[in-house]
Amino acid sequence: MKTIILNASPRKNWNTAQLLKEAQKGAESVGSEVEYIDLYDLNYTGCRSCLACKRKGAEPCKCYWKDDLSPLIDKILRANAVIIGSPIYFGEPTAQFRALYERLIFCIMSYDSHANNFNGKVNVGLIYTMNAPKNYFEAAMHPTYNTTESLMGFLGGKVMTYASCDTVQVADYSKYDMSAFSEEAKKAHHDAQFPLDLQAAFNMGADLSK
């Protein structure tokens, strides 16, 4: 088994990364080989609409744009599982997440039938972190991500989503202009909830990598 874990956060050691590293431990606990990648270290953009993947005679399920993302897409399509983590900014995952998502899905989608050219099976895990409370995420935000989850199903495996909500943004709020947030309340919630989030990420890594 091969599991690829992708950090779509610019922060390499904060909430999203911590959850992904627990997912890595979960994958490793069931014997999967894991490759962990920080997407912000790579040089790539979103889809350039070159349409090379749609040309007659083109190899199916291949992104032809020459940058750091195309070989990663090849790796994902050869893996057994991919777990992607992203913070939510203004209600959406990061630009790095979006660029990966649109290029990955577009290169496997048929423009003859809008069907799926990919015949493999890659399980997908999506981990989101955000300042919003859980009830707001479930009522107002999660429904907007249904398209993402549905299209990730083109990879042929199961798709799991987990949201870590009302997260702590910084270690010391006194150093920042963030008076809209209660540091005491944030940290109390973090101390109670984040260990559960870490366990959920571990379980996701194990479940998707079996």
Mark where each language-model region is.
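Cofactor-binding loop segments of dinucleotide-utilizing enzymes, especially the Rossmann-like FAD-
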Residues: 8, 39, 127-129, 164
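Beta-strand-loop-alpha "switch" segments that mediate conformational coupling across diverse proteins
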Residues: 160-171
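Short, catalytically relevant binding-site loops at active-site mouths
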Residues: 89-91, 132-133, 168
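Short, glycine-/small-residue-rich phosphate/pyrophosphate-handling segment
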Residues: 95-96, 108-162
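Short aromatic-enriched loop/helix-cap "lid" or pocket-rim segments at secondary-structure transitions
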Residues: 47-49, 138-139, 171-176
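N-terminal beta1-alpha1-beta2 submodule of the flavodoxin-like/Rossmannoid cofactor-binding fold
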Residues: 1-113, 178-210
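Membrane-targeting and insertion segments and their boundary/processing signals
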Residues: 70-74, 122, 171-175
